[in-house]
């Protein structure tokens, strides 16, 4: 009986609607910039916690996302789709960018929320 229930559950999970398609070809400008954990980290230069967002890529210390599209979600958030690349793997996926504090703080969600970043001057 448990096997039947598990198969039904998996069947229902496979019926989930796909996410809506991206409506933009690039990351919205409000997210573009260099972001770090603190202004002191910004002054120190690019370190392990720096996130750099451009119109066509998002750079993390250990990976790179080549942007293929974006879908705004309200005034302060967007899903950014693209091709991820690390030293050991490549895959297609998405991240969510969320602005807070009047655009001064960036939250990046990629399965889990990263430490919030402040916008570097």
What are these regions (language model features)?
Residues 1-13:
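Sec-dependent bacterial lipoprotein signal peptides
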Residues 2, 27-30, 105-109:
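Short, intrinsically disordered, charge-biased short linear motifs at domain edges
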Residues 15-18:
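Bacterial signal peptide processing site
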Residues 27-43:
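Tryptophan-anchored aromatic micro-motifs
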Residues 30-34, 50-58, 73-76, 97-105, ...:
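Short, solvent-exposed coil/turn segments at beta-strand boundaries
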Residues 40-41, 81-121:
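Beta-sheet ligand-binding and adhesion/scaffold domains
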Residues 41-86:
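N-terminal glycine/threonine-rich, aromatic-flanked beta-hairpin/loop signature
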């Amino acid at each position: 009986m448990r096997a039947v229930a598990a198969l039904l559950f998996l069947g229902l999970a496979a019926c989930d609607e796909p996410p809506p398609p991206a409506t933009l070809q690039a990351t919205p400008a409000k997210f573009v910039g260099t972001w770090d954990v603190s202004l002191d980290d910004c002054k120190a230069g690019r370190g392990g916690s720096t996130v750099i967002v451009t119109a066509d890529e998002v750079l993390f210390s250990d990976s790179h996302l080549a942007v293929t599209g974006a879908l705004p979600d309200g005034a302060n958030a967007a899903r950014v789709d693209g091709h991820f690349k690390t030293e050991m793997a490549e895959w297609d996926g998405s991240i969510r960018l969320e602005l807070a504090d009047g655009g001064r703080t960036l939250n990046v969600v990629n399965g889990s929320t990263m430490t919030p970043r402040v916008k570097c001057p």
